Design a protein with these regions (language model features):
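Phosphate-end processing signature that detects enzymes handling 5′-triphosphorylated RNA
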Residues: 1-183
């Protein structure tokens, strides 16, 4: 399936700089949809604290997402989710769209350990105004794919063996940071 994300950062690119510098406590915001055209949007906040990752999400209707894209964010104050109000406050303090990232994802689930392996390919990047027309984005990462392994308490041995791929680079990876090289 296709994933299209619009990443936000402040005028100083704090989220990008913190990622590149390996800052232990950091956050980033994105607006996301799945497929060719959005039926709805997800507003997400990803954060990392002491090496542990987390994510908060708030569903936005198609109309709300389009309002947000036009710069009308006042409706966020009326939503119940604290994330919506936090995002509104950050927008008022200068958070703004920075880049679009689009990719095709294949996801594989394994119940023991609540494991989710994702393979993200055909990664493309572009300017924020291309968010709703991702067909016009430029290829990024030279055709490389990103494999992510997410799990809860433990990673089963069979999964460890399955993801040992020759010529792969094991690292913390941010598609946002990688694709900002192309703006």
């Amino acid at each position: 399936y296709q994933v299209v994300s619009l990443y936000y950062d402040d005028p100083y690119d704090t989220a990008l700089r913190q990622k590149l510098d390996g800052v232990d406590r950091r956050e980033k915001f994105r607006l996301r949809y799945y497929g060719e055209k959005p039926a709805f949007f997800k507003l997400e906040k990803k954060y990392k604290v002491k090496g542990l990752c987390g994510k908060g999400a708030c569903r936005l209707s198609r109309e709300e997402g389009e309002r947000l894209l036009r710069g009308d964010s006042a409706f966020l104050l009326e939503k119940e989710e604290p994330l919506a109000r936090e995002f509104y406050a950050k927008l008022r303090r200068g958070l703004a769209p920075k880049t679009v990232v689009r990719y095709t994802r294949e996801a594989f689930l394994y119940a023991p350990g609540n494991v989710r392996v994702t393979l993200d390919g055909d990664i493309r990047a572009g300017a924020p105004e291309r968010f709703l027309i991702p067909q016009k984005l430029l290829p990024a990462l030279g055709g490389l794919a990103v494999v992510e392994v997410k799990y809860d308490a433990f990673l089963p041995e069979i999964v460890k063996l399955a993801v040992q791929v020759p010529n792969r680079q094991g690292t913390a990876c941010s598609k946002y940071a990688l694709c900002r090289r192309y703006d």
